[in-house]
């Protein structure tokens, strides 16, 4: 899929849902590619989890690292379903997509696939738009995000939180766009990614 097609597929349509955390996700094999997407904030519970920005250690790792507690909880609630999709589906590549809160979850999904399935590392790519920071500053796992491409608009406030002084960082490569709207147009700046893809 081209980026604009991925945007359309990854932001619309029907979703699977974990009721406990209200995490919406979907996956589909198209032309031998397993596409996985996570929906952005869509409910009060989503917003509560966005603001659950304390860091939690990612458990059962030799190399301890920390992640955004709200996004980690959402990711863990759907991890098994994504694992089943990887086991059950036939594919040659994996492409993960997320927008806004979905980008935070997609970042954790990317890391999990990279760590859990070494044979998929060269076949894995992730595109996130309007992603908040997800990973703790002192987490030494940057190499796990070589194939993660972030799209950010300079004036998009969502890409600035949690703030760097809270010891969070972005991961992956960044494709930055100036944006067409004044800084105070918060919603317009955040929703404008489709204009650049």
Residue ranges and their predicted role:
Residues 1-97, 101-197:
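Non-catalytic, mobile gating and regulatory segments of ester bond hydrolases
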């Amino acid at each position: 899929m081209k980026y604009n097609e991925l945007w359309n597929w990854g932001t619309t349509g029907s979703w699977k849902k974990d009721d406990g955390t209200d995490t919406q996700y979907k996956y589909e094999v198209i032309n031998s590619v397993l596409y996985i997407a996570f929906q952005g904030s869509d409910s009060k519970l989503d917003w509560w989890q966005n603001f659950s920005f304390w860091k939690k250690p990612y458990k059962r790792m030799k190399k301890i690292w920390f992640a955004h507690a709200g996004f980690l909880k959402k990711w863990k609630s759907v991890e098994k379903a994504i694992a089943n999709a990887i086991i059950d589906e036939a594919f040659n590549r994996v492409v993960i997509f997320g927008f806004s809160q979905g980008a935070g979850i997609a970042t954790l999904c990317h890391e999990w696939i990279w760590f859990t399935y070494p044979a998929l590392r060269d076949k894995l790519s992730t595109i996130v738009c309007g992603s908040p920071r997800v990973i703790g500053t002192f987490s030494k796992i940057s190499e796990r995000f070589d194939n993660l491409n972030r799209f950010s608009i300079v004036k998009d406030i969502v890409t600035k939180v949690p703030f760097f002084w809270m010891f969070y960082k972005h991961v992956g490569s960044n494709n930055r766009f100036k944006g067409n709207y004044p800084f105070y147009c918060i919603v317009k700046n955040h929703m404008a990614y489709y204009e650049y893809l």
